[in-house]
Amino acid sequence: MLPHMTCRHLLATAQWIADNPAWAGHPALMQVTSADIARMSSQQTPQPVIGVFEIPDHQAPVVDGRALVLALDSVQNPGNLGTIIRLADWFGISDIIASRGTADAFGPKVVQATMGALVRVRVTYVDDLAGWLDGAGVPVVGTFLDGRDLYAADDLPLSPAPIVVMGNEGSGISPEVEAVVSHRLLIPSFPPGRQTSESLNVAMATGIVVSELTRRMHSNG
């Protein structure tokens, strides 16, 4: 039913089942009442169907350099993680590699923030993010306050496609991961020299970097 997940239970009201006859007889389907749905859901106005899925045990992928990969270094806010997963889905990124310090991709707040994107994006947790990046065999891009202007760095490697690392909300990319970043970038504020916010939200920054790199890859391809 979904690319990366196995459905164990599909709990639905009689009306939902009547409106979706293709699901009739499915072994995972179980009819429940609207009151049952309300008790199980954390939403104020829940949908008439709830799916229970097995949490997948992804293995870290072999990076082939054909598409961008995201790496998250202790991104701890569930809303940020969910938004980043949704961004990845929008830009065709299939894999996110996360350190153990990153929020749980299958926590309720993250799942809600992904708006369904979690079923198409694999989130894999690794014990040693720096070691994994070092052995990936492709360029590693990260954002830093002393990095090169994202829009002026015309010599960024795009083939093979790089891994984009985003760091913790408060402390940024850790020293261990910074040591394996091959290209340091800065998202500039405009106009230059104007007093502005101290920093960008990590999910916003991810969207800016991924959008620019994707634009270049498609322009050059």
Language-model regions: role of each:
Residues 42-64:
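Acidic/glycine-rich phosphate/pyrophosphate-binding loops and surrounding catalytic core
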